[in-house]
Amino acid sequence: MSDYQETLYQGYGQRFSIDNMLHEVRTEHQHLVIFENARMGRVMALDGVIQTTEADEFIYHEMLTHVPILAHGAARRVLIIGGGDGGMLREVAKHKSVERITMVEIDGTVVDMCKEFLPNHSQGAFDDPRLNLVIDDGMRFVATTEERFDVIISDSTDPIGPGEVLFSENFYQACRRCLNEGGILVTQNGTPFMQLEEVRTTAARTDGLFADWHFYQAAVPTYIGGAMTFAWGSTHEGLRRLPLETLRQRFRDSGIATRYYNADIHLGAFALPQYVLQAIGKQDND
Protein backbone atom coordinates (compact mmCIF):
# COMPACT_ATOMS: atom_id res chain seq x y z
CA MET A 1 0.00 0.00 0.00
CA SER A 2 1.37 3.41 -0.98
CA ASP A 3 0.39 6.95 -0.01
CA TYR A 4 -0.72 10.00 -1.98
CA GLN A 5 0.87 13.21 -0.71
CA GLU A 6 -0.94 16.41 -1.65
CA THR A 7 1.36 19.20 -2.85
CA LEU A 8 -0.87 22.28 -2.60
CA TYR A 9 0.96 23.98 0.28
CA GLN A 10 4.63 24.13 1.16
CA GLY A 11 5.42 22.76 4.61
CA TYR A 12 1.83 21.72 5.35
CA GLY A 13 -0.38 19.12 3.77
CA GLN A 14 -2.29 15.88 3.94
CA ARG A 15 -1.62 12.30 2.95
CA PHE A 16 -4.05 9.64 1.79
CA SER A 17 -3.35 5.93 1.82
CA ILE A 18 -3.95 4.41 -1.60
CA ASP A 19 -5.83 1.18 -0.99
CA ASN A 20 -6.46 0.65 -4.69
CA MET A 21 -5.22 2.74 -7.61
CA LEU A 22 -8.10 2.85 -10.07
CA HIS A 23 -6.74 5.08 -12.81
CA GLU A 24 -3.80 7.34 -13.57
CA VAL A 25 -3.31 9.31 -16.76
CA ARG A 26 -1.78 12.50 -18.07
CA THR A 27 -4.53 14.20 -20.02
CA GLU A 28 -4.08 16.99 -22.53
CA HIS A 29 -4.23 19.47 -19.64
CA GLN A 30 -3.22 17.82 -16.35
CA HIS A 31 -2.16 14.75 -14.41
CA LEU A 32 -5.19 12.84 -13.12
CA VAL A 33 -5.36 10.05 -10.54
CA ILE A 34 -8.37 8.29 -9.05
CA PHE A 35 -7.86 5.89 -6.16
CA GLU A 36 -9.72 4.26 -3.29
CA ASN A 37 -9.17 5.19 0.35
CA ALA A 38 -10.75 3.32 3.26
CA ARG A 39 -11.88 6.49 5.03
CA MET A 40 -12.84 8.82 2.16
CA GLY A 41 -13.96 6.38 -0.52
CA ARG A 42 -12.92 7.11 -4.08
CA VAL A 43 -10.66 10.14 -4.42
CA MET A 44 -9.67 12.22 -7.45
CA ALA A 45 -6.58 14.40 -7.61
CA LEU A 46 -5.33 16.70 -10.37
CA ASP A 47 -1.72 17.88 -10.61
CA GLY A 48 -0.98 16.83 -7.04
CA VAL A 49 -4.04 18.46 -5.45
CA ILE A 50 -7.02 16.55 -4.05
CA GLN A 51 -10.16 17.65 -5.90
CA THR A 52 -12.96 15.54 -4.50
CA THR A 53 -13.76 12.50 -2.39
CA GLU A 54 -16.89 10.38 -2.19
CA ALA A 55 -17.14 10.86 1.56
CA ASP A 56 -17.65 14.63 1.74
CA GLU A 57 -18.28 15.93 -1.79
CA PHE A 58 -21.93 16.54 -0.93
CA ILE A 59 -21.03 19.51 1.29
CA TYR A 60 -19.13 21.33 -1.43
CA HIS A 61 -21.56 20.59 -4.24
CA GLU A 62 -24.71 21.38 -2.26
CA MET A 63 -23.39 24.73 -1.04
CA LEU A 64 -22.19 25.91 -4.44
CA THR A 65 -25.50 24.91 -6.03
CA HIS A 66 -28.46 25.43 -3.72
CA VAL A 67 -27.34 28.73 -2.18
CA PRO A 68 -27.47 30.66 -5.49
CA ILE A 69 -30.39 28.77 -7.05
CA LEU A 70 -32.67 29.12 -4.03
CA ALA A 71 -31.57 32.71 -3.42
CA HIS A 72 -32.48 33.52 -7.02
CA GLY A 73 -35.87 31.89 -6.66
CA ALA A 74 -36.67 31.52 -10.35
CA ALA A 75 -33.50 30.24 -12.05
CA ARG A 76 -34.24 28.68 -15.43
CA ARG A 77 -30.82 28.68 -17.09
CA VAL A 78 -27.73 27.60 -15.16
CA LEU A 79 -24.11 27.60 -16.33
CA ILE A 80 -21.50 25.38 -14.68
CA ILE A 81 -17.85 26.18 -15.42
CA GLY A 82 -15.68 23.13 -14.70
CA GLY A 83 -17.30 20.45 -12.60
CA GLY A 84 -16.06 17.52 -14.65
CA ASP A 85 -16.71 15.05 -11.83
CA GLY A 86 -20.46 15.60 -12.24
CA GLY A 87 -21.30 16.41 -8.63
CA MET A 88 -22.36 19.98 -9.34
CA LEU A 89 -24.42 18.82 -12.29
CA ARG A 90 -26.18 16.27 -10.07
CA GLU A 91 -27.20 18.96 -7.58
CA VAL A 92 -28.33 21.46 -10.23
CA ALA A 93 -30.39 18.74 -11.93
CA LYS A 94 -32.36 18.23 -8.71
CA HIS A 95 -34.08 21.56 -9.39
CA LYS A 96 -36.95 20.66 -11.72
CA SER A 97 -37.62 24.36 -12.34
CA VAL A 98 -34.26 24.65 -14.14
CA GLU A 99 -34.92 24.31 -17.86
CA ARG A 100 -31.40 24.28 -19.31
CA ILE A 101 -28.03 23.37 -17.82
CA THR A 102 -24.89 24.31 -19.72
CA MET A 103 -21.67 22.76 -18.44
CA VAL A 104 -18.31 23.86 -19.83
CA GLU A 105 -15.36 21.63 -18.90
CA ILE A 106 -11.93 22.12 -20.44
CA ASP A 107 -10.83 18.50 -20.01
CA GLY A 108 -13.04 15.87 -21.60
CA THR A 109 -10.90 13.10 -20.12
CA VAL A 110 -11.92 14.20 -16.62
CA VAL A 111 -15.57 13.80 -17.58
CA ASP A 112 -14.99 10.37 -19.12
CA MET A 113 -12.91 9.07 -16.23
CA CYS A 114 -15.34 10.35 -13.60
CA LYS A 115 -18.26 8.74 -15.38
CA GLU A 116 -16.38 5.46 -15.19
CA PHE A 117 -14.66 5.64 -11.81
CA LEU A 118 -16.74 8.19 -9.83
CA PRO A 119 -20.31 7.36 -10.90
CA ASN A 120 -21.68 8.20 -7.46
CA HIS A 121 -20.85 11.84 -8.08
CA SER A 122 -23.03 12.32 -11.14
CA GLN A 123 -25.61 9.59 -10.43
CA GLY A 124 -26.73 9.60 -14.05
CA ALA A 125 -26.96 13.40 -14.37
CA PHE A 126 -24.86 13.39 -17.55
CA ASP A 127 -27.88 11.77 -19.24
CA ASP A 128 -30.24 14.58 -18.22
CA PRO A 129 -31.92 15.94 -21.38
CA ARG A 130 -31.58 19.50 -20.07
CA LEU A 131 -27.78 19.25 -20.21
CA ASN A 132 -25.66 20.90 -22.88
CA LEU A 133 -22.12 19.63 -22.25
CA VAL A 134 -19.42 21.74 -23.89
CA ILE A 135 -15.78 20.61 -23.86
CA ASP A 136 -14.01 23.95 -24.08
CA ASP A 137 -12.11 26.55 -22.11
CA GLY A 138 -14.45 28.24 -19.63
CA MET A 139 -12.88 31.65 -20.09
CA ARG A 140 -13.28 31.47 -23.85
CA PHE A 141 -16.89 30.35 -23.49
CA VAL A 142 -18.05 33.20 -21.25
CA ALA A 143 -16.10 35.72 -23.33
CA THR A 144 -17.78 34.73 -26.59
CA THR A 145 -21.19 33.20 -25.88
CA GLU A 146 -24.40 35.06 -26.66
CA GLU A 147 -26.33 33.00 -24.11
CA ARG A 148 -27.46 34.53 -20.83
CA PHE A 149 -27.86 32.74 -17.52
CA ASP A 150 -29.67 33.19 -14.24
CA VAL A 151 -26.98 31.45 -12.19
CA ILE A 152 -23.32 30.82 -13.02
CA ILE A 153 -21.35 28.36 -10.87
CA SER A 154 -17.57 28.28 -11.28
CA ASP A 155 -16.43 24.89 -9.99
CA SER A 156 -12.78 25.38 -10.81
CA THR A 157 -9.54 23.91 -9.58
CA ASP A 158 -7.16 26.10 -7.58
CA PRO A 159 -5.68 29.11 -9.43
CA ILE A 160 -2.83 27.10 -10.89
CA GLY A 161 -2.63 25.36 -14.25
CA PRO A 162 -5.86 25.25 -16.30
CA GLY A 163 -7.87 26.86 -13.49
CA GLU A 164 -5.77 30.01 -13.14
CA VAL A 165 -7.69 32.05 -15.71
CA LEU A 166 -10.97 31.35 -13.86
CA PHE A 167 -9.82 33.69 -11.10
CA SER A 168 -8.87 36.56 -13.41
CA GLU A 169 -10.53 39.95 -13.65
CA ASN A 170 -11.44 39.22 -17.26
CA PHE A 171 -13.28 36.07 -16.19
CA TYR A 172 -15.40 37.86 -13.60
CA GLN A 173 -16.22 40.61 -16.08
CA ALA A 174 -17.22 38.09 -18.73
CA CYS A 175 -19.42 36.22 -16.27
CA ARG A 176 -21.14 39.45 -15.29
CA ARG A 177 -21.86 40.09 -18.97
CA CYS A 178 -23.47 36.64 -19.25
CA LEU A 179 -25.87 37.10 -16.34
CA ASN A 180 -29.52 37.95 -16.77
CA GLU A 181 -30.95 40.72 -14.63
CA GLY A 182 -31.20 39.35 -11.12
CA GLY A 183 -28.47 36.82 -11.86
CA ILE A 184 -25.94 35.37 -9.44
CA LEU A 185 -22.32 34.23 -9.85
CA VAL A 186 -20.69 31.93 -7.29
CA THR A 187 -17.16 30.55 -7.37
CA GLN A 188 -15.01 28.37 -5.18
CA ASN A 189 -12.34 30.48 -3.51
CA GLY A 190 -10.19 28.19 -1.38
CA THR A 191 -9.67 28.14 2.38
CA PRO A 192 -9.01 31.69 3.61
CA PHE A 193 -6.75 30.61 6.47
CA MET A 194 -4.31 29.22 3.91
CA GLN A 195 -5.29 31.20 0.80
CA LEU A 196 -6.28 34.61 2.11
CA GLU A 197 -4.61 36.42 -0.77
CA GLU A 198 -6.93 34.67 -3.22
CA VAL A 199 -9.94 35.90 -1.24
CA ARG A 200 -8.51 39.42 -1.11
CA THR A 201 -7.84 39.41 -4.87
CA THR A 202 -11.31 38.12 -5.70
CA ALA A 203 -12.86 40.80 -3.49
CA ALA A 204 -10.97 43.52 -5.34
CA ARG A 205 -12.09 42.14 -8.70
CA THR A 206 -15.78 41.80 -7.82
CA ASP A 207 -16.14 45.08 -5.90
CA GLY A 208 -17.89 47.49 -8.22
CA LEU A 209 -18.74 44.78 -10.73
CA PHE A 210 -21.83 43.52 -8.90
CA ALA A 211 -24.62 45.28 -7.03
CA ASP A 212 -23.78 43.00 -4.10
CA TRP A 213 -20.64 40.97 -3.51
CA HIS A 214 -19.56 38.93 -0.52
CA PHE A 215 -18.33 35.46 0.43
CA TYR A 216 -19.87 32.53 2.24
CA GLN A 217 -18.34 29.48 3.87
CA ALA A 218 -18.66 25.76 4.49
CA ALA A 219 -16.37 23.29 6.23
CA VAL A 220 -15.33 20.54 3.80
CA PRO A 221 -12.89 18.09 5.47
CA THR A 222 -11.07 17.28 2.23
CA TYR A 223 -10.00 20.91 1.75
CA ILE A 224 -7.59 21.33 4.64
CA GLY A 225 -6.96 24.60 6.39
CA GLY A 226 -10.39 25.35 7.84
CA ALA A 227 -13.66 26.51 6.33
CA MET A 228 -13.77 26.99 2.58
CA THR A 229 -14.96 30.24 1.03
CA PHE A 230 -17.20 30.74 -1.97
CA ALA A 231 -17.38 34.09 -3.73
CA TRP A 232 -20.81 35.61 -4.33
CA GLY A 233 -21.75 38.30 -6.81
CA SER A 234 -25.34 39.28 -7.63
CA THR A 235 -26.93 41.92 -9.82
CA HIS A 236 -29.61 42.62 -7.17
CA GLU A 237 -28.65 43.74 -3.68
CA GLY A 238 -31.34 41.93 -1.71
CA LEU A 239 -30.75 38.33 -2.77
CA ARG A 240 -28.15 37.66 -0.06
CA ARG A 241 -30.43 38.94 2.69
CA LEU A 242 -33.68 37.09 2.08
CA PRO A 243 -35.84 36.34 5.13
CA LEU A 244 -35.24 32.93 6.66
CA GLU A 245 -38.86 31.90 6.16
CA THR A 246 -38.63 32.75 2.45
CA LEU A 247 -35.65 30.43 2.07
CA ARG A 248 -37.34 27.72 4.11
CA GLN A 249 -40.42 27.89 1.90
CA ARG A 250 -38.37 27.80 -1.30
CA PHE A 251 -36.43 24.82 0.02
CA ARG A 252 -39.64 22.98 0.89
CA ASP A 253 -41.22 23.83 -2.45
CA SER A 254 -38.16 22.61 -4.36
CA GLY A 255 -38.66 19.09 -3.05
CA ILE A 256 -34.93 18.42 -3.18
CA ALA A 257 -33.19 16.14 -0.70
CA THR A 258 -29.90 17.32 0.82
CA ARG A 259 -27.40 16.06 3.37
CA TYR A 260 -25.82 19.39 4.32
CA TYR A 261 -27.76 22.35 2.95
CA ASN A 262 -30.78 23.84 4.69
CA ALA A 263 -32.15 27.37 4.93
CA ASP A 264 -30.52 28.10 8.29
CA ILE A 265 -27.12 26.95 7.01
CA HIS A 266 -27.70 29.12 3.93
CA LEU A 267 -28.09 32.33 5.91
CA GLY A 268 -25.43 31.51 8.49
CA ALA A 269 -22.83 30.73 5.84
CA PHE A 270 -22.59 34.43 4.94
CA ALA A 271 -21.37 35.35 8.45
CA LEU A 272 -17.63 35.72 7.88
CA PRO A 273 -15.01 35.78 10.64
CA GLN A 274 -13.35 39.06 11.41
CA TYR A 275 -10.00 38.29 9.79
CA VAL A 276 -11.73 37.58 6.48
CA LEU A 277 -13.81 40.76 6.71
CA GLN A 278 -10.65 42.74 7.35
CA ALA A 279 -8.93 41.12 4.37
CA ILE A 280 -11.75 42.07 2.01
CA GLY A 281 -12.12 45.58 3.41
CA LYS A 282 -15.56 45.22 5.00
CA GLN A 283 -16.57 46.44 8.44
CA ASP A 284 -19.29 43.84 8.93
CA ASN A 285 -21.34 41.15 7.20
CA ASP A 286 -24.15 43.45 6.04
From Swiss-Prot:
Keywords: Cytoplasm, Polyamine biosynthesis, Spermidine biosynthesis, Transferase. GO terms for biological process: spermidine biosynthetic process. It catalyses: S-adenosyl 3-(methylsulfanyl)propylamine + putrescine = S-methyl-5'-thioadenosine + spermidine + H(+). Spermidine binds at H61, D85, D155, S156, T157, D158. One of its GO terms (molecular function) is spermidine synthase activity. InterPro entries: PABS, PABS_CS, SAM-dependent_MTases_sf, Spermi_synthase, Spermidine_synt_N, Spermidine_synt_N_sf. Pfam families: Spermine_synt_N, Spermine_synth. Catalyzes the irreversible transfer of a propylamine group from the amino donor S-adenosylmethioninamine (decarboxy-AdoMet) to putrescine (1,4-diaminobutane) to yield spermidine. Belongs to the spermidine/spermine synthase family. Homodimer or homotetramer. This is Polyamine aminopropyltransferase 1. It comes from Pseudomonas aeruginosa (strain ATCC 15692 / DSM 22644 / CIP 104116 / JCM 14847 / LMG 12228 / 1C / PRS 101 / PAO1). The gene is speE1.
